[in-house]
């Protein structure tokens, strides 16, 4: 049981852990200032709690979320939702973000300000060329490198956080940004969306189930018990890691010009490593981040191309891989800050829908739910998420007032009560559906 638990924990840790995730907690720490505690609580709630719960629920659904969504909502919605989701965790956001994170941490500190733009182009050309070639022939060597590097990288970050707490813990936090002053928990909650982990959990739940079954559980009870225990352990571990990184960012002295950029996480991670361990360790961190990001990039190109090739086989895997690599390369050259900025509206739409789907799946495990009621629930949540983005992006006063009038809007959860109402209606509306029973094969 203990061995299986450890192996399962490593699997879950590997699914969630990525170099890109490390830049958001210190950014939050720096920008939240004196409002750090409610801000990091919101971040952990969305970035860890929802992500781990989504994966756990996914591992209890043998056919994956695509089957659940097709059955409970509709096949066309499942295809559309998952296509947008894969594009988000693939070429539009995650793939270019891994490349720019590797560049910002590993290469950018070594270049003069005048050469950083050209440096990014040269780096991404080489980076994506190598990623593309390997994605055409994905090798298990990359998986093995990732399994070795991930725990070493995580250990380095833990040491950095502990030593950083002693070194900078006495430094006063900076003044919180306007967003955190207005709603610390809500802003932190939205920042947690940037980890993309809940979306990745939906996409890779079937892979997780297949891998877990190979561990040879003797019964369904043992399987489920292990999943829940390890899920709690992983959630606690990531919470501690995020809180530690956030605390480091909250007390690390960041220059005003860096703070104005809006995402000081890379600066904090790089500078803290150099100040605590020296320039050699900073170079080591750069190599670790670059290799970790690279293995992630290859994995995302492969998984996204395989998904679209499986759903739309008229186009070959190679064409998909080529297209997604080129898109990732083009977007990566916009820079890390730009990628994070334009990804937020899409995530503000995708995340509420994802959370609502998970809520429906959980409730349906215990009671039958009406299909029209489940469709209504997703429709309400989607409409509110779209209205929220349109209102804030285009300053449409009517939509902003409408969203702000909903319960929990200040916590960035205006869709929550409508989702609960929709699920309650699903208990009484006709055309009830039972949940699929999970069986060990």
Question: Can you name each region flagged by the protein language model?
Answer:
Residues 9-17, 163-169, 179-245, 284-293, ...:
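Hydrophobic, membrane-embedded alpha-helices of multi-pass small-molecule transporters
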Residues 49, 53, 152-164, 227-253, ...:
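Selective recognition of specific alpha-helical transmembrane segments in multi-pass small-molecule
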Residues 60-64, 68, 126-149, 214-217, ...:
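Membrane-water interface regions at transmembrane-helix termini and the short interhelical loops
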Residues 65-70, 241-294, 345:
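TM-loop-TM module centered on a large, flexible mid-protein loop between adjacent transmembrane helices
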Residues 135-164, 343-355, 374-382:
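Membrane-interface loop-to-helix entry segments
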Residues 137-148, 185, 208-237, 255-267, ...:
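Hydrophobic, small-residue-rich membrane helices and short re-entrant helix-turn-helix hairpins
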Residues 167, 370, 374-441:
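A generic transmembrane alpha-helix motif of multi-pass inner-membrane proteins
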